[in-house]
């Protein structure tokens, strides 16, 4: 019971201390190695521990004995304490989005002269887990500092690319339809191939018996589908030119909503303002110096003229 109360007291001290975290960025599926070195190298290390905010205990370690808590196992988090207990290292394997957060490592140290007094040292590490298709440099340039911001930035970029591709596909289909209506209609069956963006093709089949042309439905890609039907009538050569302008029915389920794109603006830092202030001050000093030189020469001439008059 006494040992349990001591552990609870130590945990409360660790969680109420103001953190000074070090940030580490990794990608989904990678392994992350977190390490801490203690400053007090003269005391005797009683125990080292690792926690994850807000209130999750990962492990407690005393020399080579390691005890895991809160469903953590050695398969997920491996522990190592090299350099004669001067450092504590954990490796989190196969990172997921749930592994992102603030980790705390703590050392519980006692003096060799006074074993009843226990000192502690703790260090904070922020682990950021980025999606596999977003690099750390892209995340920094976009202004994303947290896991949720990085995921939101990736989704906005994907939606913007999808909207651009959809618009280009619509333009290509419109041009193809106009070209079809202006072509000469043959009395025999024929098959025409039309190219659509991304190397996708569909066939147009003409049947003189039914007097109609049908354009097949494009294969579905993601959630965007395009269905186009063109109806025309084939007649004899006498009234061929009177039947060209037949109604064309085109149905499309292309979304027209354009997602907003967030643009990050550059903010001036304190060093920028100091540099601007220094340049302005230098310009003012040069102006004052030029004014003094001009004033000196002008006053010298006036004194010389007064001397000549006298």
Swiss-Prot record:
Residues 301-310 are intravirion. One of its GO terms (cellular component) is virion membrane. It holds the Pfam family V-set. Its main location: virion. It is a single-pass type I membrane protein. Residues 19-121 form the Ig-like V-type domain. Disulfide bonds join 36-105. Residues 153-195 are annotated as: Disordered. Keywords: Disulfide bond, Glycoprotein, Hemagglutinin, Host membrane, Immunoglobulin domain, Late protein, Membrane, Signal, Transmembrane, Transmembrane helix, Viral envelope protein, Virion. SUPFAM superfamilies: Immunoglobulin (SSF48726). Residues 162-193 have a biased composition (Low complexity). Glycans are attached at residues 39, 113, 133, 203. Residues 17-275 are virion surface. Glycosylated; contains phosphate and sulfate-substituted glycans. O-glycosylation is required for hemagglutination and hemadsorption activities of infected cell membranes. The chain crosses the membrane at residues 276-300. Residues 1-16 form the signal peptide. It is found in: Virion membrane; Host membrane. PROSITE patterns: IG_LIKE. Heterodimerizes with K2. The heterodimer A56/K2 interacts with components of the entry fusion complex A16 and G9. Interacts with K2 protein. Heterodimer with C3/VPC protein; disulfide-linked. Prevents cell to cell fusion by interacting with and directing the viral K2 protein on the host plasma membrane. The A56-K2 complex associates with components of the entry fusion complex (EFC) presumably to avoid superinfection and syncytium formation. Via its interaction with C3/VCP protein, protects the infected cell and probably also the extracellular enveloped virus from complement attack. This is Protein A56. It comes from Raccoon poxvirus. The lineage of its organism: Viruses, Varidnaviria, Bamfordvirae, Nucleocytoviricota, Pokkesviricetes. The gene is HA.
């Amino acid at each position: 019971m006494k040992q349990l109360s001591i552990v609870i007291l130590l945990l409360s001290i660790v969680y109420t201390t103001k953190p000074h975290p070090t940030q580490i960025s990794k990608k989904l599926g990678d392994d992350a190695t977190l390490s801490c070195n203690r400053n007090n190298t003269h005391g005797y290390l009683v125990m080292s521990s690792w926690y994850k905010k807000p209130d999750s205990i990962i492990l407690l370690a005393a020399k080579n004995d390691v005890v895991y808590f809160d469903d953590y196992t050695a398969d997920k988090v491996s522990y190592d304490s090299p350099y004669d207990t001067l450092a504590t290292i954990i490796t989190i394997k196969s990172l997921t989005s749930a592994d992102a957060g603030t980790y705390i490592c703590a050392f519980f140290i006692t003096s060799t002269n006074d074993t009843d007094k226990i000192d502690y040292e703790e260090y904070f590490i922020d682990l950021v887990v980025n999606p596999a298709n977003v690099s750390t440099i892209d995340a920094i340039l976009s202004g994303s500092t947290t896991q949720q911001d990085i995921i939101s930035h990736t989704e906005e970029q994907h939606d913007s690319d999808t909207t651009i591709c959809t618009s280009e596909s619509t333009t290509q289909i419109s041009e193809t339809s106009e070209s079809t209506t202006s072509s000469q209609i043959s009395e025999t069956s024929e098959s025409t191939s039309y190219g659509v963006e991304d190397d996708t093709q569909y066939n147009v089949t003409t049947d003189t018996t039914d007097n109609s042309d049908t354009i097949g439905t494009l294969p579905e890609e993601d959630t965007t589908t395009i269905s186009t039907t063109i109806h025309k009538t084939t007649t004899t050569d006498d009234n061929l030119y009177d039947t060209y302008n037949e109604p064309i029915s085109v149905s499309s389920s292309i979304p027209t909503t354009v997602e907003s794109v967030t643009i990050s603006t550059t903010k001036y830092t304190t060093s920028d303002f100091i540099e601007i202030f220094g340049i302005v001050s230098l310009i003012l000093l040069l102006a004052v110096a030029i004014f003094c030189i001009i004033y000196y020469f002008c006053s010298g001439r006036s004194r010389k003229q007064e001397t000549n008059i006298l």
